[in-house]
Amino acid sequence: MQSIPVKNAGDRLVDAYRRTYYYLRLSITDVCNFRCNYCLPDGYHPSHERDKFLTVDEIRRAVSAFAAMGAQKVRITGGEPTLRKDFLQITENITALDGIRHVALTTNGYRMAQDVGAWKQAGISSINVSVDSLDPRMFYQITGENKFTEVMRGIDRAFEAGYRKIKVNSVLMKDLNEREFDKFLAWVKDRPIQMRFIELMQTGEMDAFFRCHHLSGQVLAEKLIRDGWQLQSKGITDGPAKVFRHPDYVGEIGLIMPYEPDFCASCNRLRVSAKGKLHLCLFGEEGIDLRDLLQRDDQQSLLQARLFAALQGKREHHFLHRGDSGIRKNLSTIGG
């Protein structure tokens, strides 16, 4: 995978606040087979829209345009992306594109034990897997699925397949998994796992749940610093997590705290939904339709022009601190 030189600012993914975007989060499906209480507590229900999910060729054209404008990292998300039967073909196409140096996957892990070797062979560079509790009963209470053993086996298989580090995501929730912080610390002490705690975020369908269970990640940050954990610097394609390391631990701790005052200042990522809409912010507008420019290979220059023009309208920051989550009903539609 080669790096493509970007000639001038007009060719690059740069917004009006001079933030440069190297990272694309690409949802390839809204469908998920888990029923997490902070996202889809009633399970997935197909929408009545006629639009189908992006095809393999549409995905290739979309990522190609982002790569030509300087994007280096793609994260494949959902829903649960591995539910697509053409998931491996999608992955292989993305990894073959010039300029794309890193292809990551976010998964609930239910297929990980059986398929992780094929994922690695297809070109998945790194994996984030959701584990909201290390207690099988609490895992079931949060996810609605009795898959704890299978997911944990999948993490072990990922290391056997050659992944040197796995990122594990856990949504931090008061009165549910908040008491497991020390258990998670012990779990990563001798394992090369980056354990990432994500602050519960307010969405349109989950206001009551948010009010009941939100807990600030700052509480954990202060505890980590008191206990000798050190904050690490970020790379240009890193996500929003603040990463901490400790000399006595093999693993790392990451904190994603969207309610911090400066959370948006280092934003480096854009999102494309499974139906081909560009979303400039996780908690933003309805989305800019790209699909009409994903039909032929000779539309790349028009697609890049639309991307650049749209990016100039990206807001300086979200308004979560005001209780404004935009039009986002839940996170399954855009992959978080």
Swiss-Prot record:
Domain Radical SAM core residue range list: 16-241
Entry cofactors: [4Fe-4S] cluster
Residue sites binding [4Fe-4S] cluster 1 per the record: 32, 36, 39
Listed EC numbers: 4.1.99.22
Keywords: 4Fe-4S, GTP-binding, Iron, Iron-sulfur, Lyase, Metal-binding, Molybdenum cofactor biosynthesis, Nucleotide-binding, S-adenosyl-L-methionine
Pfam family, one: Fer4_12
Matching InterPro entries: Aldolase_TIM, Elp3/MiaA/NifB-like_rSAM, MoaA, MoaA_NifB_PqqE_Fe-S-bd_CS, MoaA_twitch, MoCo_biosynth_MoaA/MoaC, rSAM
Residues that bind GTP: 25, 75, 106, 167, 269-271
Role summary: Catalyzes the cyclization of GTP to (8S)-3',8-cyclo-7,8-dihydroguanosine 5'-triphosphate.
Name of the protein this chain belongs to: GTP 3',8-cyclase
Organism: Actinobacillus succinogenes (strain ATCC 55618 / DSM 22257 / CCUG 43843 / 130Z)
